[in-house]
């Protein structure tokens, strides 16, 4: 099951279909209006990257990663990463090297890192929170959020509309 939230969404759609044929969804609002904590954190990192040179951030992150837990450790570790690396760390349980250790055969398809980094590369001049929103709108929102909502509602003959994403 790609996303466990599909189960309650299925039953919610099934129940709604008993009463209505069309529902409105808030899908896309968090991505559009910056509603995820990750976007706020991206703003903190943007400020950090303005004030601290990259080599120093990378060094601080590498050193912090080897130390026992302390307040601010994770900020320093993530602060030593590029925005796309922080994005990957926040969205995937296993990074590519870790995934490969669990698999019997090598991964031959495009890795999530390559796929996501491509979208960051498309918008290099934007601030980090806006980059995160852009990437989410072109990946997570399309291939997870909207896909599962559409499938679960269609499985129950329910039309789902997403007004926040309507261009009109």
Tell me what each language-model feature is.
Residues 1-3, 123-136:
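Structural motif
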Residues 112, 124-126, 141-144:
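Short, flexible segments with low predicted structural confidence
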Residues 137-151:
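Short Ser/Thr-interspersed hydrophobic loop/turn segments at strand-loop and sheet-helix junctions
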Residues 1-112, 128, 151-168:
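ATP-dependent adenylate-handling active sites, centered on carboxylate activation for C-N bond formation
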Residues 109-122:
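A short, charged helix-loop
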């Amino acid at each position: 099951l790609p996303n466990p939230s599909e189960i309650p969404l299925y039953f919610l759609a099934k129940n709604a279909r008993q009463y209505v044929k069309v529902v409105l969804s808030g899908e896309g609002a968090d991505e559009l209006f910056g509603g995820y904590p990750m976007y706020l954190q991206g703003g903190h990192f943007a400020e950090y990257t303005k004030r601290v040179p990259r080599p120093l951030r990378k060094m601080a992150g590498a050193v912090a990663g080897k130390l026992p837990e302390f307040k601010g450790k994770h900020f320093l570790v993530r602060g030593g990463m590029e925005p796309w690396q922080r994005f990957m760390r926040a969205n995937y349980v296993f990074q590519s090297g870790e995934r490969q250790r669990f698999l019997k055969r090598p991964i031959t398809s495009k890795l999530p890192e390559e796929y996501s980094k491509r979208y960051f590369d498309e918008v290099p001049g934007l601030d980090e929170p806006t980059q995160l929103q852009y990437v989410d709108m072109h990946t997570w929102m399309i291939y997870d959020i909207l896909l599962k909502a559409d499938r679960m509602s269609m499985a129950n003959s329910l039309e789902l509309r997403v007004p926040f994403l309507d261009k009109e």
